[in-house]
Amino acid sequence: MQIMIKSLLEDLNKYVKAMQENSENAKQFSDLFRENYMSLKEEQQLDDFYERLWSEFSSDPKIFTLILSIIYDVVRDDRSLYEIFYLLQHSDMDLLSQIYIRDQLETCIFRNSNLSRNYRNRRNLHKQLLTKLENLIDVNLDYKPYKFRNKKRIVLTICQLLGDSHAPTRVLKEICYILQNKFHYEVLVIVAIDDMYDGDLSSIWYHPAISFYNENYNGSFTVKYKEEKINGFQFIMNHRNLGIIKKLINIICNYNPAFIWHMGNRCLFADLFRKYTTVMAMPFTDGYTISEAQIMCTYLNSHSDEIKDMEAYLGETGQKPLQYDLRLPLTPSMKTYHRKDFNIDDKDFVITVVGNRLDIEVNNEFKQLLRKILKISSKISIAFVGIFESYPSFINEDEIFSTRTKFLGYQEDLIGVLGIMDLFLNPPRQGGGGGAVYSLYNGVPVVTLNYCDVANSLEPEDTCNSIQEMFGLIQKYFYDKVFYQKQSVKALEIRKKRGLDVFFNNTKTMLEEAVELFE
């Protein structure tokens, strides 16, 4: 067994060297490492392999992290991510490196790693990092009770503000609009971008995810949305801006809002305020975010086992859960699209797959499902919409992909384009909720697993427990025309739930319930 482990380490070394030299042999070494790794896994010998790695590399946690991230990139086995998690919690690595690595881990989780079910460990790591950051910044301010705050001011925090086609950005802007225009709040938006990436840190994670942001918003900014002006401030959360963080805390505390409302994923900056005022944290995905906020708000709740575990943990920490029945109003397309616009046959049964991370989400497991679907009938075709840079290589993998799929590219008017489809297929992933809602609005049924954002737009009986169930449901949609028509009519019911009056009333109810929890 030791010989196998030694051989596996040598394979990994060859692969890394080939990648550094941009050698054409890199894929060969990658395949060899993957094959030998999976053999060890099947023989239940991975513990010995990782113990060997710990004994050889744990003295240099950054190099060790890099090696583990390479392993994950090659084999996509969550075990390597668990090892990084443990390393982060027990090494003496500097704080900013820890934050950077944690953000890479969370990106892997969002991209559908099974590690996403380990909510408690993620929370413990977040609290550990938050405590270190608080000690580093060292702000001494007293907590201000709600009765002494300005009841007509709200500060919203977010980690990324892009264009209106970016679903989280649109959610934030819609909420800003209704808070200002209908509830007459004074709203200030703080965009705190977690971007610890620099030349040194790039050497501790293989193929790191990079945060995208609009540089035009740096510093103070004003954006117009509908007839409202939204004022805000954007800064980069990195080692060069720790002074800005401290200054912003003092400015915002003097601004004295009724509460801080964080939207999105984990945000150390927003959590810093929990010692001075009330913080409410709300993710854009299913369940609850990673936060030490006093109030944990959710508007997507699939009630899966994972979410139930989150809620149990909130009970243990004393954090207060809050349900927000967020139903953003939908604006129909001003244009009518036809299949001929995209060279799609009118007689085909077209299944669409929509996303801005299709390069990652169309993985081997999902490709197998697509092959099975396309073999049901020659009348079935698949249309990808979004960002899929690897589509040319995807269609070269199999003739059935090259002849029976199309890539429509990124579509600004997504709600209009989805009207020409027959079915919306959601890959195993956390996101996809926006595209699913647009499909339902057009009367296009949705096929999805039951533990993701998309599931929140469907009745439980219309979701699937497994990939195999998804395949069976697609077959039923294709063959059973009566069932398809019934589900199409059911999909259109979403229009009744997406008016401005519903948005207003549900937001009013949530704000009233939130105030009751403040003190």
Segments predicted by a language model, with ranges:
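Catalytic binding pocket for nucleotide-activated donors in carbohydrate/polymer assembly enzymes
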Residues: 309, 427-495
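Active-site-proximal region of nucleotide-activated glycan assembly enzymes
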Residues: 114-124, 276-333
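Conserved catalytic-core segment of nucleotide-activated headgroup transferases in glycan assembly
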Residues: 166-177, 304, 315-397
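Short acidic alpha-helix that forms the nucleotide-activated donor recognition element
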Residues: 246-250, 410-422, 441
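Nucleotide-activated donor-binding/catalytic signature segment of Leloir-type glycosyltransferases, i.e.
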Residues: 392-411
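Acidic donor-binding loop of glycosyltransferase active sites
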Residues: 255-259, 419-432, 444
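N-terminal subdomain of nucleotide-sugar transferases
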Residues: 2-44, 49-56, 83-87, 91-216
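A charged, aromatic-enriched C-terminal amphipathic alpha-helix characteristic of glycosyltransferases
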Residues: 336, 342, 479-519
